[in-house]
Amino acid sequence: MGIQISLPMMAFLVFMTGFAGFVDSAAGGGGLISLPAYLFAGLPPHYTYATNKFSAACGTTFATASFFKNGAMNLKVGILAAIGSFAGSALGAHIVLMLSDEVLQMMMFIILPIAAVVILWRRNLPDENRDDGTLNLKKALLALGIGFGIGLYDGMVGPGTGTFAIIAFTSLMGFDLRTANGNAKVLNLASNYASLFTYLSSGLVVFPVGIPCAISNIVGNIIGSHFALRKGAKFIRPMMLVVLVLLLGKLVSDAVL
């Protein structure tokens, strides 16, 4: 499919995907910025999903490396969650390929209000680490379950995935915000690549658009992860509220337009 993007629109996309990478690395939810941007630029929904996954996967790779380098994650839990996330996201992406553009848009409109309520309800997350450092069968299954559920959501819908992962790791597993964010990065990385492999095999990634956006997303992720690691909860909490505002804004725009 030949997709033409004007130079000013390409510049807009590069800026927006860079900002999306910044937000995503700090608190998740970068897709709330990048997905509407791709759609606004004129990419059809399936191509938007695929190209967004390409740029997001590239950026998340660098953010995950930053959190790993700084020891801001529980690697065992993160890997288990990533395994579940990879399976869930691959399944979700295959389901998306079977749906029409109209169904995808309707699905977003139904699911995003629920997502907004969840984020608003859990906006005041604890910052103390209540995890005892052990990994038993219950925790392992919980990590796999969190990964699969959020991965399925990411493969089918996407926006807010990192934020939901942070909420799950703090609320259900007792991690502080910094560690939960690191675990979320590992989960999200696996989810992004699982979906991306599915979209690549279907030829849906628009590389002339995706490559410059991926570079911008990488830069945004590097800067955002730097701030999140240095500032911790003081930076992550406000960014999560920014994600909530963006999510609610998207809901309003979908309802009006």
Residue ranges and their predicted role:
Residues 46-50, 181-185:
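Small-residue hotspots at the loop-to-helix junctions and early N-terminal turns
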Residues 147-157, 195-203, 210, 247-257:
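Hydrophobic alpha-helical transmembrane segments in multi-pass integral membrane proteins
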Residues 10, 53, 108-112, 116, ...:
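Residues within membrane-spanning alpha-helices of integral membrane proteins
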Residues 1-44, 130-181:
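Selected transmembrane alpha-helices and immediately adjacent juxtamembrane segments
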Residues 14, 18, 22, 53, ...:
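Residue-level signature of the transmembrane alpha-helical core
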Residues 40, 93, 97, 106, ...:
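Transmembrane helix-loop junction
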Residues 50-103, 107-110, 192-242:
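Selective hydrophobic functional segments
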Residues 62-72, 109-135, 248-257:
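Transmembrane helix exit motif
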